[in-house]
From Swiss-Prot:
Pfam families for the chain: UBA_4, UBX
Record's protein name: Plant UBX domain-containing protein 8
Coiled coil: 412-478
Record organism: Arabidopsis thaliana (Mouse-ear cress)
Residue spans of biased composition, Basic and acidic residues class: 322-334, 443-475
Gene name tied to this protein: PUX8
Subunit organization: Interacts with RABA5C/ARA-4.
Highest classification ranks of the organism: Eukaryota, Viridiplantae, Streptophyta, Embryophyta, Tracheophyta
Length: 564
C-alpha cells in the first residue's frame, strides 16, 4: 500500500483537526484519496468517540421478561420488501416502535427493571467527585427524563441525586446487554394496558425524534447517519409517515387536536416541579405520559437519570424561566424558537441552519480552493456592498466617443447608400428583364401572325392556281380567222402589255374574264373591262351575257382593264 504524501496529511489535518496518526490511518484506509478519507472521518463522527463501559455481571436486578434483540430498520424494511409488500404497508404503530428502538444512534427510552415491590428501595447516586454511599451493585436509572415503560401507579420513595459528568469521563451505557437481555418491568396482562403502552411508546418516539431534530440543527455532528440510511429515501418516507400516523392516532384517542410541538411544550410545563430539574441538567424535559399519573402521592419525587452530555460546537440554550412559568400551551408554542421546532430552516438548504451551511461552504472552499458557485448561497447574510458613485468621463474620452459615434454614423450611412444602390440596380435589372420578356412575347406573337398570314396566302395562292388551271381548261377553242362569227378582242393590261384572242360572238363575257385571269397579271374579281368609245364598263354582273348581247359585234374590238 502506498504511503500518503505529507501534503495530503497536512490538508487532512487542516480540514478535520485530527492528529497525524488518525490522518495517516484514514488516508491509508482509502488508498490516499483525500476526499473519501475526509468524508469517512466526518461520517463516522460520533461513533469515534463512543466508549462502552463493561457490563456489571453482579447486577442483582430482577428479570421479569427477556426482550428479543431488535433488528435494524434497514433489515426490516428489506425483509418486508422481499416478501412483496409495499414499503408503506409497514406504517403501523409496531413498525414505528421497532424503527426507533432498533436505531443505534437514537436514544433509547428508559426501562424500570424492578418490580413494584422492589421500587421502595431508596436509590441515591452521589456526584462522581465524591464517594458514593451505595455499593457498585446499586442500579443506575437510565433516562428518567423520558417516560418509563411502567403501567399503573408507581410509588418510588427515596432520594435520587443527579450525577452530571462531562463527556470525556462518562462512557455510554453498554448496548449488548441492554438490547439482548433487557429486563422489562412488570406490565398488566389486560388488553387496555397493552394498548396504552403502545400509545405511550409512539408518543415518546415522536417527541424524542422532534427534540433530536432540534438539537441536530445546532450541531451537525450529532445528526450524522450511516451512508446506507441516507441513500435509502424509502426508509425516510416510511419513518416520517409512521410518526405522523402515530401522532394522529394518539391525538384522536385523547380527543383533541394539537401539533407535536404543542404537546411537547405543554408537557414540559406540566413536568416542571418545585425543584425545577430542567434547570439542573440544562435540557428540555420530555413529556410524561398521561397514563403515568395514577398516583396521588404529593411526596413523590421523579427519578433522575445519570445522563451524559456531549461537548459540541453548539448546544441548546436553557429554557426560559418565563416560558416555564407560562400557563397556556399557545404562549409556550409561540415562544419556542425555530431551531427547537425544527422547522425554521429553509427547505432549499436541506433543512440545515445557516451556521451549518456556512461551515459546509468553508469546508468545500478549503478542500477545492474556492467558494462554489451554487444556487443556494444565502445572499441575505452577506453584508451590503456599497455602490461606487459614477464619475463624469474625461474630455478626451468624450471626444473619442463623439468621433467613434460619427464614424459609426458615417459607416451606417455608407452601408445604407450601398444598400440603396444595390436595391436600385436590382429594380433596374427586374425592369429590364420585364421589358425583354414583353418584347419577346410581342415578337413571338408577331412571328406567329406572320406565319399564319403566310400560310393563309399560300393557301390562297394554291387555291387560285387551282382555279386558274380550271379556267384555262374551260376556255373554248379559238376559232379560225375567216370564220363569219369570229371577233378579235385586244386587251391592254395594267402593266401596258396587250393580249388578244379570237372569240365567237356567242361566247359569254365570263370566257373573256377567264382569258384575262389565266394571264396572271391581275387577280380575279379585282378589275373591270372598259370599252373606250362609247364608254361602257363590263363587270361581274354581266359575266353571263354573250358578247353579241353586250354590243361587241365588230370584227375587232379594243378594251382595257380598270382596277376596282
Amino acid at each position: 500500500m502506498a504511503t500518503p504524501n505529507q501534503e495530503a496529511i497536512d490538508t487532512f489535518i487542516s480540514i478535520t483537526g485530527a492528529s497525524d496518526a488518525v490522518a495517516l490511518q484514514k488516508l491509508e484506509e482509502h488508498r490516499g484519496d483525500l476526499n473519501q478519507a475526509v468524508n469517512a472521518y466526518f461520517s463516522e463522527g460520533d461513533r469515534n468517540v463512543v466508549r462502552e463501559a463493561p457490563v456489571n455481571d453482579d447486577d442483582e436486578m430482577d428479570i421479569d421478561d427477556v426482550i428479543p434483540a431488535p433488528q435494524s430498520p434497514l433489515s426490516m424494511f428489506n425483509a418486508a420488501r422481499t416478501i412483496g409488500r409495499p414499503p408503506f404497508s409497514l406504517l403501523d404503530s409496531d413498525f414505528a416502535r421497532r424503527v426507533f428502538d432498533s436505531d443505534p444512534l437514537m436514544p433509547r427510552p428508559p426501562f424500570v427493571s424492578h418490580p413494584r415491590e422492589v421500587r421502595q428501595i431508596p436509590i441515591e447516586v452521589k456526584d462522581s467527585s465524591g464517594p458514593s454511599g451505595r455499593s457498585s451493585d446499586a442500579p443506575t436509572i437510565e433516562d428518567v427524563t423520558e417516560t418509563a415503560h411502567v403501567q399503573g401507579p408507581v410509588t418510588t420513595q427515596g432520594t435520587v441525586i443527579i450525577d452530571e459528568e462531562s463527556d470525556d469521563d462518562i462512557p455510554f451505557a453498554p448496548m449488548g446487554r441492554s438490547r439482548q437481555d433487557r429486563p422489562a418491568g412488570s406490565v398488566a396482562n389486560n388488553n387496555n394496558q397493552d394498548y396504552n403502552d403502545i400509545e405511550e411508546e409512539m408518543i415518546r418516539a415522536a417527541i424524542e425524534a422532534s427534540k433530536k431534530e432540534a438539537e441536530g440543527s445546532s450541531n451537525p455532528l450529532l445528526e450524522e447517519r450511516p451512508l446506507h440510511m441516507e441513500d435509502d429515501d424509502d426508509i425516510a418516507i416510511a419513518v416520517t409517515m409512521s410518526l405522523k400516523s402515530a401522532e394522529e392516532e394518539v391525538l384522536r384517542s385523547q380527543g383533541y387536536k394539537a401539533s407535536t410541538s404543542e404537546i411537547g411544550a405543554s408537557a414540559v410545563t406540566a413536568a416542571q416541579g418545585p425543584q425545577d430539574t430542567q434547570a439542573l441538567n440544562g435540557r428540555l424535559a420530555a413529556p410524561s405520559s398521561p397514563f403515568d399519573d395514577d398516583s396521588d402521592d404529593v411526596d413523590e419525587q421523579p427519578l433522575v437519570r445519570h445522563r451524559p452530555r456531549r461537548a459540541a460546537s453548539g448546544s441548546l440554550a436553557p429554557p426560559n424561566a418565563d416560558r416555564s412559568r407560562s400557563g397556556s400551551p399557545e404562549e409556550e408554542h409561540a415562544s419556542i424558537n425555530p431551531a427547537e421546532r425544527g422547522s425554521g430552516f429553509p427547505s432549499e438548504w436541506g433543512g440545515i441552519s445557516s451556521e451549518e451551511h456556512d461551515e459546509a461552504v468553508m469546508l468545500e472552499a478549503a478542500m477545492f480552493g474556492g467558494i462554489p458557485e451554487t444556487g443556494y448561497n444565502h445572499l441575505p447574510f452577506l453584508p451590503p456592498q456599497p455602490r461606487a458613485q459614477p464619475r463624469p468621463p474625461s474630455p478626451s474620452l468624450t471626444a473619442q466617443r463623439l468621433i467613434r459615434e460619427q464614424q459609426d454614423d458615417e459607416y451606417v450611412a455608407s452601408l445604407q447608400a450601398d444598400r440603396d444602390k444595390e436595391m436600385k440596380s436590382i429594380r433596374d435589372a427586374e425592369a429590364r428583364q420585364l421589358e425583354e420578356e414583353t418584347a419577346r412575347k410581342a415578337f413571338l406573337e408577331e412571328e406567329k401572325k406572320k406565319e399564319e398570314e403566310a400560310q393563309r396566302k399560300l393557301e390562297e395562292e394554291q387555291e387560285l392556281e387551282r382555279q386558274l388551271d380550271a379556267k384555262e381548261a374551260s376556255l373554248p377553242k379559238e376559232p379560225q380567222a375567216d370564220e363569219e362569227n369570229a371577233i378579235t378582242l385586244l386587251i391592254r393590261m395594267p402593266d401596258g402589255t396587250r393580249r388578244g384572242r379570237r372569240f365567237l360572238k356567242s361566247d359569254k363575257l365570263q370566257t373573256l374574264f377567264n382569258f384575262i385571269d389565266i394571264a396572271r397579271v391581275v387577280k380575279p374579281n379585282t378589275y373591270r373591262l372598259v370599252r373606250p368609245y362609247p364608254r361602257h364598263a363590263f363587270g361581274d354582273g354581266e359575266s353571263e351575257s354573250t358578247l353579241n348581247d353586250l354590243g361587241l359585234t365588230s370584227k375587232q374590238e379594243a378594251l382595257f382593264l380598270e382596277l376596282i
